[in-house]
Amino acid sequence: MPIGVPKVPFRIPGEEDNRLYRERLLFPGQQVDDEIANQLIGIMMYLNGEDENKDIYPYINSPGGAVIPGISIYDAMQFVVPDVHTICMGLAASMGSSVLTGGEITKRIALPHARVMIHQPASSYYDGQAGECIMEAEEVLKLRDSITNVYVQRTGKPLWVISGDMERDVFMSATEAQAYGIVDLVAVENTEDLL
């Protein structure tokens, strides 16, 4: 996926990225940051305006990343009219798992060998004044509460379970993520086409 300002998918034949956009396939396959979040949100908003009846399919393979951009992707997924089918391939860790969880309930899928990881948000601001660090810690706690509530709403797990699990890195297989409520389905391998 190209990186940069949100790009509008034009209907020019032969351009692979545009073809994928026309098919409504998105590939957030990197660390979540402002640039990637803005691009994904821009594409989702464009696709929403283009046709509210066609669903959107982000294929997630992300090690996580920044919390605020990740939450903005989640919020955009809730805002658009078309259903968003999230598909986990590879790894959906940290904010990647939050984005995965944000797909339309019953339309969140993990491929058979996918991995999912949840944990609490971290702060990267350590070299400031004591007062700044306290304010940052308060903000991180607010973000943690917000992310915890997303998992509670989207998985059906009680608050105390999610809070306890977010205290550490919790890795899950595709079937474990399904049992946890992060995804609804685990794709099955097609063995008919194998030699």
Curated annotation (Swiss-Prot):
Disulfide bonds: none annotated. It is found in: Plastid, Chloroplast stroma. Pfam families: CLP_protease. Cleaves peptides in various proteins in a process that requires ATP hydrolysis. Has a chymotrypsin-like activity. Plays a major role in the degradation of misfolded proteins. The active site is at S94, H119. This is ATP-dependent Clp protease proteolytic subunit. Component of the chloroplastic Clp protease core complex. Keywords: Chloroplast, Hydrolase, Plastid, Protease, Serine protease. Its EC number is 3.4.21.92. GO terms for molecular function: ATP-dependent peptidase activity; ATPase binding; serine-type endopeptidase activity. Its main location: plastid. It comes from Cycas taitungensis. Belongs to the peptidase S14 family. HAMAP family: ClpP. SUPFAM superfamilies: ClpP/crotonase. It is an enzyme of class 3 (hydrolase). InterPro entries: ClpP, ClpP/crotonase-like_dom_sf, ClpP/TepA, ClpP_His_AS, ClpP_Ser_AS. One of its GO terms (cellular component) is chloroplast stroma. GO terms for biological process: protein quality control for misfolded or incompletely synthesized proteins. It catalyses: Hydrolysis of proteins to small peptides in the presence of ATP and magnesium. alpha-casein is the usual test substrate. In the absence of ATP, only oligopeptides shorter than five residues are hydrolyzed (such as succinyl-Leu-Tyr-|-NHMec, and Leu-Tyr-Leu-|-Tyr-Trp, in which cleavage of the -Tyr-|-Leu- and -Tyr-|-Trp bonds also occurs).
